[in-house]
Amino acid sequence: MTLWINGDWITGQGASRVKRNPVSGEVLWQGNDADAAQVGQACRAARAAFPRWARLSFAERQAVVERFAGLLERNKGELTAIIARETGKPRWEAATELTAMINKIAISIKAYHVRTGEQRSEMPDGAASLRHRPHGVLAVFGPYNFPGHLPNGHIVPALLAGNTIIFKPSELTPWSGEAVMRLWQQAGLPPGVLNLVQGGCETGQALSALEDLDGLLFTGSANTGYQLHRQLSGQPEKILALEMGGNNPLIIDEVADIDAAVHLTIQSAFVTAGQRCTCARRVLLKSGAQGDAFLARLVAVSQRLTPGNWDDEPQPFIGGLISEQAAQQVFTAWQQLEAMGGRTLLAPRLLQAGTSLLTPGIIEMTGVAGVPDEEVFGPLLRVWRYDSFEEAIRMANNTRFGLSCGLVSPEREKFDQLLLEARAGIVNWNKPLTGAASTAPFGGIGASGNHRPSAWYAADYCAWPMASLESDSLTLPATLNPGLDFSDEVVR
């Protein structure tokens, strides 16, 4: 029984699904997808639970969420292992995901009050008030790269605001999704407030097609996000929050400490085996001897990165990708770039057949025409050379995406110029692109999405503002507008 609907664990009526560790092949989870009827059942449960949940005081909803935070803390070790085994990422990195999940809850509580709480301004004849109200029933689509942390960034603010939810985790991480839902159950969440439907494309399409849905919160690929946007077009009554990918540029200008710059680049491009939406996909490197030295050092250090299993000791920097198919797709993308005329500096290697272990790849594309503006979601870094900083900014902005952008340079003036001209939601200076804080907006523009699914800014799309003019008594104004006559005379 792997679906959680209206407080009950039930068996899916859709296709069967098996999840294996992407490196060892160990079977981790087995179950069945939710069919369209069960998706509808989850929606009805959420709709029925909404009035009571929304009418609870904020303190009562907060108490449930804080109990969930306590359960995360107490079950940190077990949940870390589940996420690591299912995604293939090393234990050390899965542990950082749990820490982020826990920390985000307190930030979400504060954000509710600061960004979407209640405000009152006194007026001579009354008051002007601002309140926020929940949308109703929201669908949350989770990604596979951070199957606990990223859905949590939607779910917690949505619940705090008073919404009820239907959650569909990625079909590649059903075990993590189920494990987190069982903690919500232990936290005492009332039946129907949060519902879990497992499944792939068919389940997702049934969920997004629900008429009685008030909104959809999505983190994932641009292709899926575009499909959802088209599906919900013409329905302005539904909130749609999209956080998608990026073809992110990292500008390497003047470098004083080459090893520090190489470390920043590896953290930007290859952490999580390149499976972060903010990962650097393009290095824009200033032409010259210093750029040559940086590139040689980057290749030398990157070729030492050997992916391993989640529990290897000593721990590897990167693990496997989410699946063997995902690793093969990245490898094929490198082959296609090479066939277009790219110059391979570090060839990626599929280490073992039947696994997702893939070493990083680096390929220079300077002067190659027609390179696709696509996100390759894995450890593949493309390099272009530039001559002037203005050219670097033009190259950085030459993408339909707009998620993250970074600059390595000692010159504050160049960063100030980049801040003015960059088309990206995240612009960093001498910091990895993959660093993020839950107190800052996380998201981008263009094909990278619209709203900002972090603990702080998620409050904005989880509730709608209600403005009120109020007075505890009704009196006739002392001065009336022209043309109004309230005298006792009878007009003949």
Swiss-Prot record:
Active site: E243, C277
Enzyme Commission code: 1.2.1.71
InterPro entries: Ald_DH/histidinol_DH (IPR016161), Ald_DH_C (IPR016163), Ald_DH_CS_CYS (IPR016160), Ald_DH_CS_GLU (IPR029510), Ald_DH_N (IPR016162), Aldehyde_DH_dom (IPR015590), SuccinylGlu_semiald_DH_AstD (IPR017649)
Molecular function (Gene Ontology), one example: succinylglutamate-semialdehyde dehydrogenase activity
Enzyme class: oxidoreductase
PROSITE patterns for the chain: ALDEHYDE_DEHYDR_CYS, ALDEHYDE_DEHYDR_GLU
Ranges in a coiled coil: none
UniProt xrefs under Pfam families: Aldedh
Keywords (A to Z) from UniProt: Arginine metabolism, NAD, Oxidoreductase
Biological process, per Gene Ontology: arginine catabolic process to glutamate; arginine catabolic process to succinate
Record field: catalytic activity: N-succinyl-L-glutamate 5-semialdehyde + NAD(+) + H2O = N-succinyl-L-glutamate + NADH + 2 H(+)
Keyword Aminoacyl-tRNA synthetase: no
Pathway(s) this gene product operates in, as recorded in its UniProt entry: Amino-acid degradation; L-arginine degradation via AST pathway; L-glutamate and succinate from L-arginine: step 4/5
Domain of life of the native organism: Bacteria
Entry keyword annotation includes Aminoacyl-tRNA synthetase: no
Residues that bind NAD(+): G220, S221, A222, N223, T224, G225
Function: Catalyzes the NAD-dependent reduction of succinylglutamate semialdehyde into succinylglutamate.
PANTHER family reported in the protein's UniProt record: ALDEHYDE DEHYDROGENASE-RELATED
NCBIfam families registered for this protein in UniProt: arg_catab_astD, PRK09457.1
Protein family according to the UniProt entry: Belongs to the aldehyde dehydrogenase family. AstD subfamily.
Protein's recorded name: N-succinylglutamate 5-semialdehyde dehydrogenase
Source organism of the structure: Escherichia coli O157:H7
Gene label: astD
